[in-house]
UniProtKB/Swiss-Prot annotation:
Keyword set, alphabetical order: Amino-acid biosynthesis, Arginine biosynthesis, Cytoplasm, NADP, Oxidoreductase
Pfam family, one: Semialdhyde_dhC_1
Broad enzyme group: oxidoreductase
MF (Gene Ontology): N-acetyl-gamma-glutamyl-phosphate reductase activity; NAD binding; NADP+ binding
GO CC, any one term: cytoplasm
Pathway(s) served: Amino-acid biosynthesis; L-arginine biosynthesis; N(2)-acetyl-L-ornithine from L-glutamate: step 3/4
EC number: 1.2.1.38
Stated name of the protein: N-acetyl-gamma-glutamyl-phosphate reductase
CDD domains in the record: AGPR_1_C (cd23934), AGPR_1_N (cd17895)
GO terms classed as biological process: L-arginine biosynthetic process
Native species: Bacillus cereus (strain ATCC 10987 / NRS 248)
Length: 345
């Protein structure tokens, strides 16, 4: 099956290229850019030399559909909302890595993203692509809203507790830390090497755009869920996310019960790995892979459960999950082309 990538020169775009070039079923028909049309991709990123030869093209839905069936949008928020109606109109399936189609309520999107929302008729067609929890919906979708990186790690950790109804609905606290690639390719003062090296920064306190995305998905599984407390930090690594979830249980529990809950929830999910009791993952252990690793603890003194969830923000948090969703759409095994062993060193 032929695919196209729009926004091919951003970090999400080049990760898609890397994965798709190794995929046994998908092949890249075309690469598209806004600012570097006419350039060979190897001139922009020399690490692709002798691997692929593609000239970056203009974005024309009528031309793209002549060769491709699926389009990956690795474009910023706002851009995807503008492009997607044209792509859907010519019969293309769209997997969008931005946040433009994640929120069902356009008012909430505008409140958190500070920009105009996509048209409601397009929003209504979008399926939120958290693969492990939305398989049946993804399978028949024409438009996938690929989840955010923080939201992916947070939701995979939180949903088993929320669905089971064993935690106090107003007790969810999520502390998240991310590598700098999650901030995108465009440099800022905060991501500048002298500012970030040997340092740690909290940002978007109480206003991160993944908050409503997480709350919306939690509410699908438990309408009693209340607003969450969510904080994000930038740490001096290139890629990787660690989310630590805290929540208070409604009744006394044993750690074995919680361990069993997670193991049973994800026993059919190839990319979610639950650590044995008392062990906890680190981002390095999933780097370069599509895995989400989790460890669970329970504090009998406070009645709080702690879940540690780690992913590679460029893989399970972006390009890897996008291809996982494309596999589902194409009727392939979810793991096709994604069985990469983590790059530990």
């Amino acid at each position: 099956m032929k695919v196209a990538i729009i926004g091919a020169t951003g970090y999400g775009g080049i990760e898609l290229i890397r994965l798709l070039e190794q995929h046994p079923y998908f092949s890249i028909a075309s690469l598209h850019s806004f600012s570097q049309v006419g350039e060979c991709i190897t001139n922009v990123y020399p690490h692709f030399q002798n691997v692929l030869v593609h000239t970056l093209q203009e974005i024309d839905a009528e031309e793209i559909v002549k060769e491709a069936e699926i389009v990956f949008l690795a474009t910023p928020a706002g851009v995807s909302a503008e492009l997607t109606p044209k792509l859907l109109a010519v019969g293309l399936k769209v997997i969008d890595l931005s946040g433009d189609f994640r929120m069902k309520d356009p008012f909430i999107y505008e409140q958190w993203y500070k920009r105009a929302a996509a048209k409601e008729e397009i929003l209504s067609k979008a399926v939120y692509g958290l693969s492990e929890w939305k398989r049946s919906e993804v399978q028949n979708a024409n438009l996938i809203a690929n989840p955010g990186c923080f939201a992916t790690a947070a939701l995979l950790a939180t949903l088993p507790l929320v669905r089971s109804g064993i935690i106090e609905e107003d007790s969810i606290i999520i502390d998240a830390k991310s590598g700098v690639s999650g901030a995108g390719k465009t440099p800022t003062t905060m991501t500048h090497f002298p500012e970030l090296y040997d340092n740690l920064r909290i940002y978007k306190v109480n206003e991160h755009q993944h908050v409503p995305e997480i709350e919306q998905m939690l509410a699908e599984w438990n309408r009693e869920t209340k607003p969450i407390t969510f904080s994000t930090h930038l740490i001096p690594i290139s890629r990787g996310i660690m989310v630590t979830l805290y929540a208070k249980v409604k009744r006394e529990m044993e750690i074995e019960q919680l361990q069993k809950l997670y193991e049973e929830t994800y026993e059919q999910s190839a990319f979610v790995r639950i650590r044995t009791q008392g062990e906890f993952p680190s981002p390095k252990e999933v780097r370069g892979s599509n895995y989400c690793d989790m460890g669970i603890a329970y504090d009998e003194r406070t009645g709080r459960v702690t879940v540690v969830s780690v992913i590679d923000n460029m893989m399970k948090g972006a390009a890897g999950q996008a291809i996982q969703n494309a596999n589902i759409i194409a009727g392939l095994e979810e793991t096709t082309g994604l069985q990469h062993m983590p790059l530990y060193l």
